[in-house]
Amino acid sequence: MPARFDPPSSTVSHRPVTRSCSARRPTPPKPQFKNNPPRSQTPDPKTRALTPLPSLSPSIPVKSAAVEKPWKTHDCRLVLEDGSVWSGRSFGAKGTAVGEVVFNTSLTGYQEILTDPSYAGQFVLFTCPEIGNVGINLEDMESTQAHMGGMLVRHLSLNVSNYRSAMSLPEYLEQQNVIGISEIDTRAITRRLRDTGCLNGIITTDASKSDEELVAMAKDWTIVGKDMISEVTCAEPYEWSDPTGEEWEWAAEAKASTKGSLHVVAYDFGVKHNIMRRLASFGCRITVVPASMPAAEVMAMDPDGILFSNGPGDPSAVPYAVENAKAILGEVPVFGICMGHQVLGQAFGGETFKLKFGHHGGNHPVRGPSGRVEISSQNHNFAVKPDSLPKEVEVSHINLNDGTCAGMVYPAMRAMTIQYHPEASPGPHDSDPCFEDFVVMMKAAKREKAI
């Protein structure tokens, strides 16, 4: 029978607490409130009234979180395939969703994580206890929609305070048909995932389904071997033209000297906007193509370099991407990020495997070829087996948490890959020089071609 877990101890309790001590004088009884929560009593005239400050940007509406009531009853369940059941409060969409539960250790950037296509098919549990306090804005989207299957949080902020906020997190999730659950013991679930590995789960607001039915549904679903990339890739090629304002111009000098001279074709496995912003900041012209576009059609676009982007799921489920990579290797410089790293790893002749609980967060240490340690932003559940690679391929980066392969170079093929996210969003920018390395590689290849 599924094991049920009570809500965390911080949940409001309405049972009276009695204390007795014969050595103390009895205290007068506290006033009994009939309303829940209690209305404020007559204010003390000596107490200074707090007057809210006027908005610094009155023309920008700042909305509060669309939470019905902070004391509403638990109306949602998270059911894991191991039989554990966690009761909580729903926010966002209603209904039932299935996915793989992973935990993310980032303290900021829930909007970027929510809109990262790499999270398609997954429920993201945030280890940060407070989520939703800055709402949702229109500038920090990493794609045009939310992709994660569900959101798990300890506490959903009841107030939104940010001058850029356009809507609350619950409002956005409802708009995007993503279900969320709060007031669950995220620390206990994280420890469970750490010890047992990733687990499939069900989030539901449907009280008619039994726990046993939901456990069976979770066990029947799997992300392994499933082509998730086809669900997030673009339908047809397009030119990246998103304006990059001053806040994104980190390489203005390089952009001025490169503008328009380098053409990058990006295979869209679920590419994040900030990856393209970073390449555009170096003056690259970017054409984004569907994940299944044949290599011959891509090479007909006369690219100076090929980007194999990040994306969701299992690299072994997309053999068409591996075959395209094999056909392109040696023709022009290539750069693989995250899923692109795994696809190129298989194209090099290597193998990939599923990690126990994956790497998800903005605080993962990686050692590069110079010995310098970078703090990186990571989001992946699969990795490349170093001992399966041919001797011509060098492992350039190592994840210092578990020793897994975090980057490769294949000098003869002008190929470089990293298993994590140099563009961050969210996360540190320690690995941003990878984009410049790719640009330098393309410039060198173009000079040789001109000779």
Predicted segments with their positions:
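Short solvent-exposed loop/turn micro-motifs enriched in small/polar/acidic residues
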Residues: K69-K72, H359, P390, L400-N401
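Cysteine-nucleophile active-site neighborhood
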Residues: A300-I375, N381-P386, G427-A445
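Active-site-proximal beta-strand elements of phosphoester/diester hydrolases
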Residues: H263-Y267, S376-S377, M416-Y420
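Catalytic beta-strand/loop cores that center a nucleophilic Ser/Cys/Thr
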Residues: R372-M413, A450-I451
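N-terminal chloroplast transit peptides
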Residues: M1-R25
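Proline-centered loop/turn at the N-terminus of a beta-strand
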Residues: I179, H263, P333-F335, E351, ...
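RNA-binding accessory domains that recognize and position tRNA/RNA substrates
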Residues: P2-A3, R25, K30-F33, R39-M301, ...
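Active-site glycine-centered loops adjacent to acidic/histidine catalytic or metal-binding residues
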Residues: D185, C338, H380, H421
